[in-house]
């Protein structure tokens, strides 16, 4: 079988991914010109490289259209309801670190934990005539964390199409769930992360689609071993 590996198409994610594969003995070159979205591994037959956006990689891995992909754990877990059953997080690659967090306005002085936020949510409708509004691009992770992990049910999700951190100030939401690397943007928008409000500590991962034909395939095993040895 031909093994397809999806790698980020641009930016630091592309550079870091290519560097790890090169350390693993798999030098990747573009097929055609430097802007091509296809590539190959020098000296290795039956391996195809496709360059996609990080979100596209998460989707293609989930559907089984590619065998391996390098993308953020947050994108995979947000995109797939049963991520661990459908894919294997085969290796954590040590770059692209960012946390998916719950952040509330700094002026909410007495709200520091998810339990505090649960109390606010329970009281919010009586006080304001509506449910607590959460702006996010991560609706699945938000629901799992609020309803599944903390038993908070009285909220509504507002889809964020732009800069999520600006939603409370604009009045489109009360709090946010967003991804952050340093927290500086949250602070600039007068938001604070709850003490137990880290939903996921994400980073770039080598992700493998769980396929029956991968079992006992020496090329699959070789790729896994090579990448892990390069970390």
UniProtKB/Swiss-Prot annotation:
Q: Where in the cell is it found?
A: Cytoplasm
State the oligomer form and interacting partners: Heteromultimer composed of HisG and HisZ subunits.
HAMAP family, from UniProt? HisG_Short
Q: What class of enzyme is it?
A: transferase
**Record-stated family:** Belongs to the ATP phosphoribosyltransferase family. Short subfamily.
InterPro entries per the UniProt record, alphabetical: ATP_PRibTrfase_cat, ATP_PRibTrfase_CS, ATP_PRibTrfase_HisG, ATP_PRibTrfase_HisG_short
Q: What is its main location?
A: cytoplasm
GO molecular function per UniProt: ATP binding; ATP phosphoribosyltransferase activity
Task: Give the record's keywords alphabetically.
Answer: Amino-acid biosynthesis, ATP-binding, Cytoplasm, Glycosyltransferase, Histidine biosynthesis, Nucleotide-binding, Transferase
Gene Ontology terms: biological process: L-histidine biosynthetic process
User: Gene3D superfamilies this protein is in?
Assistant: Periplasmic binding protein-like II
> Could you tell me the EC number(s) of this protein?
2.4.2.17
Q: Which reaction does it catalyse?
A: 1-(5-phospho-beta-D-ribosyl)-ATP + diphosphate = 5-phospho-alpha-D-ribose 1-diphosphate + ATP
Which residue ranges traverse the bilayer? none
- GO CC annotation, single: cytoplasm
From what superkingdom does this record's organism come?
Answer: Bacteria
This protein's pathway reads: Amino-acid biosynthesis; L-histidine biosynthesis; L-histidine from 5-phospho-alpha-D-ribose 1-diphosphate: step 1/9
What's the domain remark here? Answer: Lacks the C-terminal regulatory region which is replaced by HisZ.
Give the function comment from the record.
Answer: Catalyzes the condensation of ATP and 5-phosphoribose 1-diphosphate to form N'-(5'-phosphoribosyl)-ATP (PR-ATP). Has a crucial role in the pathway because the rate of histidine biosynthesis seems to be controlled primarily by regulation of HisG enzymatic activity.
- Protein name stated in the entry: ATP phosphoribosyltransferase
- NCBIfam families, A to Z: hisG
